[in-house]
Amino acid sequence: TVRRSVASASPLKPEIIEGVDICFVRELTGGIYFGEKRREGGVATDVCTYTEDEVARVLRLACRLARERRGRVTSVDKANVLETSRLWRDVATRVAAEEFPDVRMEHALVDAAAMQLLQNPRAYDVVVTENMFGDILTDEASVLAGSIGLLPSASLAEEGPGLYEPIHGSAPDLAGRGLANPCGAILSAALLLRHSLGLAREAETVETSVYATLRRGLRTADLAGSNDTTASTADFAAAVANEICGDGQGRAIA
């Protein structure tokens, strides 16, 4: 979600990004990243494979999430040229029609989706796509918020615990310097509360505490403007913790 408090950090115009709220669902265990790879002489090959079950599993998750949001899913593929994408689109259409008739399913080619993401990001609610396309589109989407350090993620299975982490890498060049933005990590904890522990109110408390801290003009270096107070990683995290503990629900979390 792009909030007004950080809209100035985005390279896009405020009227384009304010209020943008997109949930990306990326398939993580299949596709070209996990296909057969070989190199012989001057020829290299990467094989992209998807099964109906793999596609149906991630589509069901996207549709369940859409039911909790605005009820719309955009399935992104390259069905005009790729056989795996044609399978993806067929399965997406069937799962939505047979199992989630209350969810509006739309299809988009990945190149058009990448363009629309910058021109009119409010057009999207839940975006679901295969592994490589999701890898690219989520990094592109980080530009909307102004910093990749703001964004959380969850790796979810149909059953069992999830894995929660910010979408950025380890950034070893920032280690020990107090420059990293902790928002992605803190908001990932909120996702854990909501999706693995079923604690929606507590998750909302964490999220609103992050946004309240940003509204006060406290920023880490990646977001700070001329009128903002630049905080270290530890100072920003402490300010969020104070917001959480200042709330009755927050004290219960602590």
Q: What function would you assign to each model-found segment?
A:
Residues A175, S196-A254:
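Internal helix-turn-beta structural module
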